[in-house]
Amino acid sequence: MKFNIPIFLTIFRVILIPFFVIAFYLPIESSPFITTLIFFIAGVTDWLDGYLARKWKQTTRFGAFLDPVADKVMVVAALVLIVEHQHTFWITIPAIIMISREIIISALREWMAELGERSKIAVSWWGKWKTTAQMLALGGLLWRYNNYMEIAAIILLYIAAILTIWSMIQYLQVAKGSLLDNIQL
């Protein structure tokens, strides 16, 4: 595989994940800030690797595989850490919704790829809005700077959960015909 910067950025994001988890558990006052900073850097590299891959025409199958995996592992890690820290039903429910959606849509994309119809379920604007709300919510809940930030982050978490459900419904509707045509009971 030929080296390219977008792939390097994606691999860098994967490498950040254990440091992200370690930073969360550091027994120092600045741990929430450091954790959020790592999460923010991962988010920037996620945007940048896709932008550069398209701009420089360096998209690869490996990048197309690894990029969403890195994203999902980082988001799931953040959700698990936040649920553990908050230890409340009100955070756990949207986290379960988001993690479930990621698993379902990943499986759906794999299924559609098997059928040769992967392009039918490309990322939608609903998915992009969901991701934006989700990242802002997770960043706020990781940082925990003050009560106002936490309240705003929880509101964004619920907005993200609603968009999560909505975007999943949209993806399933697009794939419904292909799914029904290929179900064998």
Curated annotation (Swiss-Prot):
Catalysed reaction equations from the record: a CDP-1,2-diacyl-sn-glycerol + sn-glycerol 3-phosphate = a 1,2-diacyl-sn-glycero-3-phospho-(1'-sn-glycero-3'-phosphate) + CMP + H(+)
Pathway listed: Phospholipid metabolism; phosphatidylglycerol biosynthesis; phosphatidylglycerol from CDP-diacylglycerol: step 1/2
Coarse class of the protein's main subcellular location: membrane
Membrane topology: Multi-pass membrane protein
Subcellular location, record wording: Cell membrane
Transmembrane segments: 7-26, 33-52, 89-108, 151-172
Gene Ontology molecular function: CDP-diacylglycerol-glycerol-3-phosphate 3-phosphatidyltransferase activity
Example of a GO cellular component annotation carried by this entry: plasma membrane
Cited Pfam families: CDP-OH_P_transf (PF01066)
Cysteines joined through disulfide linkages: none
EC number: 2.7.8.5
Signal peptide, first to last residue: none
One Gene Ontology term from the biological process aspect of the record: glycerophospholipid biosynthetic process
Keywords on record: Cell membrane, Lipid biosynthesis, Lipid metabolism, Membrane, Phospholipid biosynthesis, Phospholipid metabolism, Transferase, Transmembrane, Transmembrane helix
Known function: This protein catalyzes the committed step to the synthesis of the acidic phospholipids.
UniProt similarity note: Belongs to the CDP-alcohol phosphatidyltransferase class-I family.
Protein name: CDP-diacylglycerol--glycerol-3-phosphate 3-phosphatidyltransferase
Originating gene: pgsA
